[in-house]
């Protein structure tokens, strides 16, 4: 049940953050145009990607709650990961555009209405601080990729607002017009970094990669070290979505075991694996007589057929 309460809290946090950020983003975009500040516009661009990522995260949560059906036996849990990829890609594109725009401006800094820029960026900082605080106190910023993504966005947004504030102050006091494009580039690099990381982690999950926090050798030792298991092969460990890890393998046991004895062994293994963060476990029990390649990790069928022709 803990899981459900958590999802509800996460959803509420996302909804409140979405409303606050979208509202402020509109103000900041208009402000950026009126004051002619690229730092504000780049921060608004970042806010836009935030607001999209929050919206997608909300849709992902809603979809992930839909039950699995005959057509999608895992349910819609992966949507969250697809959403994270799209979001990451959007961040990368936005940041590259801002860098391009800023380089243009260095050679020819336009006139910026600094007071407006300063006011808007200070409001932005306050909004970001509020949203970050709501996320920290109410959401699961550690384990849930979607909330983590949204939280990282907000944190780098905050840096964006700080950048715009500093740029406005530099222009007001020293007349340094280049401070505006410089602040934009710094924000853009931060955006690029978080976009790259979110995309990389999501693609790893889509490629059925081994979850980050799982040590395969340790898992093999754990299963093979369980009394009654002789060895395992055809092992797969993957993430269905962030925080939901699955494992399947074939385990060789003594052919004299009764079904209830093998159930006991399974229960032990499931218990051990749950402590290591794997909750969805499928183990096929076999005896020595069941002929298989003994590779711990599975080979594709094509290779197996080739091997059989040689025998």
UniProtKB/Swiss-Prot annotation:
Q: What induces it?
A: Repressed by CzrA.
Membrane-topology annotation of the record = Multi-pass membrane protein
Q: Where's it found, cell-wise?
A: Cell membrane
**Which InterPro entries is this protein grouped with?**
Cation_efflux, Cation_efflux_CTD, Cation_efflux_CTD_sf, Cation_efflux_TMD_sf, CDF/SLC30A
- GO terms assigned for molecular function: zinc ion transmembrane transporter activity
- Leader sequence range is none
Name one process (GO BP) from the record: cobalt ion transport
What stretches pass through the bilayer?
13-33, 44-64, 79-99, 116-136, 158-178
- UniProt cross-references to Pfam families, sorted A to Z: Cation_efflux (PF01545), ZT_dimer (PF16916)
Q: Which residues lie on this side of the membrane: Cytoplasmic?
A: 34-43, 100-115, 179-311
Report the superkingdom from the record. Answer: Bacteria
UniProt function note = Involved in divalent cation and potassium homeostasis in the cell. Catalyzes the active efflux of zinc, cadmium and cobalt, in exchange for potassium and H(+) ions.
* Family indicated by similarity: Belongs to the cation diffusion facilitator (CDF) transporter (TC 2.A.4) family. SLC30A subfamily.
Q: What protein name does the entry list?
A: Cadmium, cobalt and zinc/H(+)-K(+) antiporter
Annotated organism of origin: Bacillus subtilis (strain 168)
């Amino acid at each position: 049940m803990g899981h459900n309460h958590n999802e509800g809290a996460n959803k509420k946090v996302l909804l409140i953050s979405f409303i606050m950020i979208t509202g402020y983003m509109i103000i900041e975009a208009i402000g950026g145009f009126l004051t002619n500040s690229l730092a504000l516009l780049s921060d608004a661009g970042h806010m836009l990607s935030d607001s999209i990522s929050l919206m997608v995260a909300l849709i992902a949560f809603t979809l992930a709650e839909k039950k699995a059906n005959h057509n999608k036996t895992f349910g819609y849990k992966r949507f969250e990961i697809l959403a994270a990829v799209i979001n990451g890609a959007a961040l990368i594109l936005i940041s590259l555009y801002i860098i391009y725009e800023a380089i243009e401006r260095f050679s020819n800094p336009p006139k910026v209405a600094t007071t407006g820029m300063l006011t808007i960026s200070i409001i932005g900082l306050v909004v970001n601080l509020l949203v970050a605080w709501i996320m920290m106190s109410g959401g699961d910023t550690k384990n849930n990729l979607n909330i983590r993504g949204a939280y990282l966005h907000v944190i780098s947004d905050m840096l964006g607002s700080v950048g715009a504030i500093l740029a406005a102050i530099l222009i007001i006091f020293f007349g340094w017009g280049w401070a505006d494009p410089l602040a934009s580039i710094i924000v853009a690099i931060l955006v690029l970094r978080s976009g790259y990381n979110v995309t990389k982690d999501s693609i790893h999950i889509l490629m059925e990669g081994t979850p980050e926090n799982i040590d395969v050798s340790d898992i093999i030792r754990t299963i093979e070290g369980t009394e009654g298991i002789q060895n395992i092969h055809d092992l797969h460990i993957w993430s269905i979505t962030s925080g939901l890890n699955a494992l399947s393998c074939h385990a060789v046991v003594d052919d004299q075991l009764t079904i209830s004895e093998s159930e006991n062994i399974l229960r032990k293994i499931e218990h051990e694996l749950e402590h290591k963060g794997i909750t969805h476990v499928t183990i096929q029990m076999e005896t020595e007589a069941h002929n298989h390649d003994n590779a711990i990790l599975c080979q594709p069928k094509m290779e197996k057929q080739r091997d059989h022709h040689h025998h």
